[in-house]
C-alpha cells in the first residue's frame, strides 16, 4: 500500500508539473501571436477578452495616387526644349564613297542591296567643316513611278570634339523624309527627336534640319549660324573646303 501511495503521488506531481508547463507554453505562444498580429495592424487582448479583434488596413493605392507618387519620385526628367540644328552633307567623290554591295539579281537597286557610305559634313551656314557622316543604307525597294529608291538608313553625324548624333529611319531619294534621332554623345548626350532630310542632288548633296530634345545645355553658337537656304547650287566657304583653322571646328572628324 505504501508503494502504491508513493506511485500515485509521483504521478500526480508529474501531471501537475506537465499542466503547469503547458499553461506557461500556451501563454508564451499567445504573446508571440499577439506581437505578430500587432505587426500586421491587428490587436488582441488575449484569451477571455470581451473586446473584438480589430484590423487596421493600409490605405488603398489608387492608380491616380500611384501615378502621383511616381511623378513625385521622378528626378531630372528629360529636357523637352526643342533646339534646331542645320547641317549640309556633301560628297565630293574623293572618299571612295558610297560603295554598292549587290544582293538583288537586278541591274537596278533591289531589296537587300547594301550601301555603306561616308560624306563630309558642314555647318548650316557652310562656314565650317564639322566632320563626316558614316553609316549604312539598306535598299528596301526601287520605286519606278517616282524614279527613285527607298532605303532604310542607320548612320551617325560626327562633330569633332562636340561629339556625335545617331539617326535611323527611311531615306527616300524622291522626296523629303524624317528619321528618328536615336541618341548622341558629347554635347549631344541624351538627344532624341527627329531630323528632316532634304535631297538636293542625289546622292552628293543633302540638307538636314535636326529638331533636338533632351540636351542638357544650349547648342554652341559655332554650330547654329543662320543656315544658307538649301539649293542644288550651294557650296561650302573656301576656308571650310581648304580646312583652314578658321574654317573647321576643334578636332573636326575627317
Curated annotation (Swiss-Prot):
Q: Where in the cell is it found?
A: Plastid, Chloroplast
Describe, from its UniProt entry, the tissues in which this protein is expressed.
Answer: Highly expressed in fully developed leaves.
GO CC annotation terms, alphabetical: chloroplast; chloroplast envelope; chloroplast thylakoid membrane; cytosol
Point to the regions of Low complexity compositional bias: 44-56
Give the residue range annotated as the organelle targeting sequence: 1-78
Enzyme nomenclature, EC number: 5.3.99.6
Q: List the keywords (alphabetical).
A: Chloroplast, Isomerase, Plastid, Stress response, Transit peptide
Name the catalysed reactions: (9Z,13S,15Z)-12,13-epoxyoctadeca-9,11,15-trienoate = (9S,13S,15Z)-12-oxophyto-10,15-dienoate
* Annotated segments matching region Disordered: 44-79
**Induction text:** By dehydration stress. High local and systemic induction by wounding.
Kindly give the InterPro entries that the UniProt entry links to this protein: Allene_ox_cyc, Allene_oxi_cyc_Dirigent, Allene_oxi_cyc_sf
List the molecular function annotations (GO) for this entry: allene-oxide cyclase activity
Q: Primary place of residence? A: plastid
Query: Which superkingdom does the taxonomy of this entry point to?
Result: Eukaryota
Q: Which residue windows does the record flag with biased composition (Polar residues)?
A: 65-77
Pfam families, per database record? Allene_ox_cyc
Single GO BP term: jasmonic acid biosynthetic process
Q: Give the range the annotation lists for the signal sequence.
A: none
* Cysteine pairs bridged by disulfides in the record: none
Give the function comment from the record: Involved in the production of 12-oxo-phytodienoic acid (OPDA), a precursor of jasmonic acid.
Report the family membership. Answer: Belongs to the allene oxide cyclase family.
- State the remark under miscellaneous: The four allene oxide cyclase proteins (AOC1, AOC2, AOC3 and AOC4) are encoded by duplicated genes. They are very similar, and most experiments involving antibodies do not discriminate between the different members.
Q: What name appears for this protein in its UniProt entry?
A: Allene oxide cyclase 1, chloroplastic
What species does this protein belong to?
Answer: Arabidopsis thaliana
Phylogenetic classification of the source organism: Eukaryota, Viridiplantae, Streptophyta, Embryophyta, Tracheophyta
Amino acid at each position: 500500500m505504501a508503494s502504491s501511495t508513493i506511485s500515485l503521488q509521483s504521478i500526480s506531481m508529474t501531471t501537475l508539473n506537465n499542466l503547469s508547463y503547458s499553461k506557461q507554453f500556451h501563454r508564451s505562444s499567445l504573446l508571440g501571436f499577439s506581437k505578430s498580429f500587432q505587426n500586421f495592424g491587428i490587436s488582441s487582448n488575449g484569451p477571455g477578452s470581451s473586446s473584438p479583434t480589430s484590423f487596421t488596413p493600409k490605405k488603398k493605392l489608387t492608380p491616380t495616387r500611384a501615378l502621383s507618387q511616381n511623378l513625385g519620385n521622378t528626378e531630372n526628367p528629360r529636357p523637352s526644349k526643342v533646339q534646331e540644328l542645320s547641317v549640309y552633307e556633301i560628297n565630293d567623290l574623293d572618299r571612295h564613297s558610297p560603295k554598292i554591295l549587290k544582293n538583288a539579281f537586278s541591274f537596278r537597286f533591289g531589296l537587300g542591296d547594301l550601301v555603306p557610305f561616308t560624306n563630309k559634313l558642314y555647318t548650316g551656314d557652310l562656314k565650317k567643316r564639322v566632320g563626316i557622316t558614316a553609316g549604312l543604307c539598306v535598299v528596301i525597294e526601287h520605286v519606278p513611278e517616282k524614279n527613285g529608291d527607298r532605303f532604310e538608313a542607320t548612320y551617325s553625324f560626327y562633330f569633332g570634339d562636340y561629339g556625335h548624333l545617331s539617326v535611323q529611319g527611311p531615306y527616300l531619294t524622291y522626296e523629303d523624309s524624317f528619321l528618328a534621332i536615336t541618341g548622341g554623345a558629347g554635347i549631344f548626350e541624351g538627344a532624341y527627336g527627329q531630323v528632316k532630310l532634304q535631297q538636293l542632288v542625289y546622292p552628293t548633296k543633302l540638307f538636314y534640319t535636326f529638331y533636338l530634345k533632351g540636351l542638357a545645355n544650349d547648342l554652341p553658337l559655332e554650330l547654329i549660324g543662320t543656315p544658307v537656304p538649301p539649293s542644288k547650287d550651294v557650296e561650302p566657304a573656301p576656308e571650310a573646303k581648304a580646312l583652314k583653322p578658321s574654317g573647321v571646328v576643334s578636332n573636326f572628324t575627317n
